[in-house]
Structure formats: C-alpha cells, structure tokens
Amino acid sequence: MEGLKAARAIALLTYRCEEGLFKQNEDSDDTIFAGKVGSYYRHQTSKFVKDWDAYSYLYVCDEVDSNNVGRGRGGVAKAIAQIKTDCTFICMSSDELFPPEDMRPLSELIPGSRYHQIETPYGHDGFLIETAAIAEILASAMP
C-alpha cells in the first residue's frame, strides 16, 4: 500500500506546476508551505489507494506507456491525418504531461481542427479547475 501511495505521489508531481501549487496553498495564515503540500499529497494518495490496487495501477501505466497511435498505421502523422471529423484541442498552458508545444503541432495534422490554449497555473489538473473556460470552448464547438 505504501509503495502505491509513493507511486501516486510521484505521478502527482507532474499534474501541477510549481506556480499552481503556490497558488492553491496561498492564504493569510502562517502555516509552512511544505506542510500544506505534504498534507495535500497524503490526502490524495490515501484517497487513491481506496480505489486502486497495485496491479491495476501497473496495468494502466503499462498501457499508457506502450500506446502508440501510429503503430501499424505508417506513423503518428499518417494516423492522425486520417481523422475526418471536426476536432477541438484544448490545452492547458502549464501542462507538463501534454504540453502546448506538443499539442499545437498535433492539432495541425488534422485539417480544420481548432486549437485553444487556456492560460492556467494548474498544469495538467487545469482541465479539472478551468471548467468555465472549457465549457465556453466546447459550447462554441458544438453545432
């Protein structure tokens, strides 16, 4: 259980950028910042291990790590270029898992796709926090 908590804590490090952690934990009290972040990670990892076991987590990690949309399709660019539907890309400016410098070129491989970048300090977790901005983009993308 402790190993799974440690693995999840390490994964969480990539979900928020430093600025997002500071923003989330700023307030007027004198609590030590590191204590707040540690408390946040302990809380999140304790929640996580209630729903996941180590084997399920390893399986999902293996699937994510081995995913290659271009495998057997002539590469990523060829595979993506075969998409014939309207696509809307929404990227978080501080996302380190799916950074803008990777997402914009990907969107350009699909004719007629739309790319939107939301300025946020919350990294990958921005998609959970910037819901109003996402809703506005999706509303404009829906017929």
Task: Give a label for each model feature.
Residues 1-47:
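Alpha/beta-hydrolase-fold enzymes
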Residues 13, 51, 109:
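Conserved catalytic core of Hanks-type protein kinase domains
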Residues 43-44, 59-79:
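Active-site nucleophile elbow and catalytic-triad environment of alpha/beta-hydrolase enzymes
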Residues 55-62, 136:
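Feature representing long, continuous alpha-helical segments
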Residues 66-68, 96-99, 123-126:
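Flexible loop/turn segments at secondary-structure boundaries
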Residues 72-76, 85, 96-108:
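Short alpha-helix in the alpha/beta-hydrolase fold that links the catalytic acid
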Residues 83, 89-91:
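Short beta-strand/loop motif that positions the catalytic acidic residue
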Residues 104-105, 112-143:
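Catalytic active-site module of serine/aspartate enzymes centered on a nucleophile-bearing elbow/loop
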